[in-house]
Regions:
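Catalytic helix-loop patch of NAD(P)-dependent Rossmann-fold dehydrogenases
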Residues: 82-97, 109-110, 118-166, 173
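SDR active-site strand-loop-helix element
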Residues: 6, 31, 68-72, 111-117, ...
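Conserved mid-core alpha-helix of short-chain dehydrogenase/reductase
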Residues: 55, 96-100, 218-221
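Rossmann-fold cofactor-recognition segment
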Residues: 42-52
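Conserved glycine-rich Rossmann-like NAD(P)H-binding loop of the short-chain dehydrogenase/reductase
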Residues: 25-34
Length: 222
């Protein structure tokens, strides 16, 4: 079986590729942006601009994958406030480009779209634990783009009969995560304090927020 991992240069990509090759025995191709540095000895790595539908169509026709894992995203909530246009372009336009490219294929692969627990937004009292059909109330730009991606997946599935699966994954943690994310940031601060690079104070944001965290290796296994 052939798998195509779109946007494999981030945190989750290497873990997913390792699972697909070592545990599933798949032949894997991974895409990255031109600026990203990504070397893998267990997969073929190719450059792809998710905003260029012509590139996507060409890649899909050449690879003829059985499965597509769409990881390409601007995935920082904080950065989505700083650059909403880029977040919307990558997360929404990029998703539309992929789905429209899949629609043009004779061989229709199964597509996995990665949503976010952020889509649920502000949870009301009595709604926990959250279930899949809980009301979606995006509270930030990143969450809104992921909710839109979810709706686009359903629309393309219903209208064109595409085999699309969607998940709303909650916060991932694990080795090699960048300090852009909260747990990795806390860990980096602790390490810097131990090495004398930072005063013995951990700087935090809103500690009243409640989140579920899942090890990235458990996420890709699921």
């Amino acid at each position: 079986m052939k798998a195509l991992v779109i946007g494999g240069g981030g945190f989750v990509g290497p873990y997913l590729v390792r699972h697909l090759t070592d545990d599933c025995g798949y032949e894997v191709t991974v895409t990255k942006t031109e600026k990203e540095q990504l070397v893998m000895d267990n997969a073929v790595v190719k450059n792809l601009d998710i905003l260029d539908i012509g590139q996507i169509v060409g890649l899909l026709k050449a690879e003829q994958p059985d499965y597509i894992f769409h990881l390409a995203a601007q995935s920082s909530v904080a950065y989505s406030w700083k650059n909403p246009t880029l977040t919307i372009d990558v997360n929404i336009k990029g998703c539309v480009n992929l789905l429209d490219a899949v629609r043009q294929l004779d061989k229709k692969p199964r597509v996995l779209l990665i949503g976010s627990g952020e889509e649920y937004g502000h949870i009301k009292e009595g709604e926990c634990p959250i279930v899949e059909d809980n009301t979606v109330r995006p509270g930030n730009i990143y969450a809104a783009t992921k909710a839109c991606q979810n709706m686009l997946g359903k629309i393309y599935s219903d209208a064109y009969g595409l085999d699309i699966m969607m998940v709303r994954a909650f916060n991932h943690i694990g080795p090699n995560q960048t300090p852009m994310f909260v747990v990795a940031d806390f860990c980096k601060q602790v390490a810097d304090i131990e090495k004398g690079r930072q005063e013995p104070v951990i700087y935090v944001g809103n500690l009243s927020a409640k989140r579920d965290f899942t090890d990235v290796r458990d996420v890709v296994n699921a």
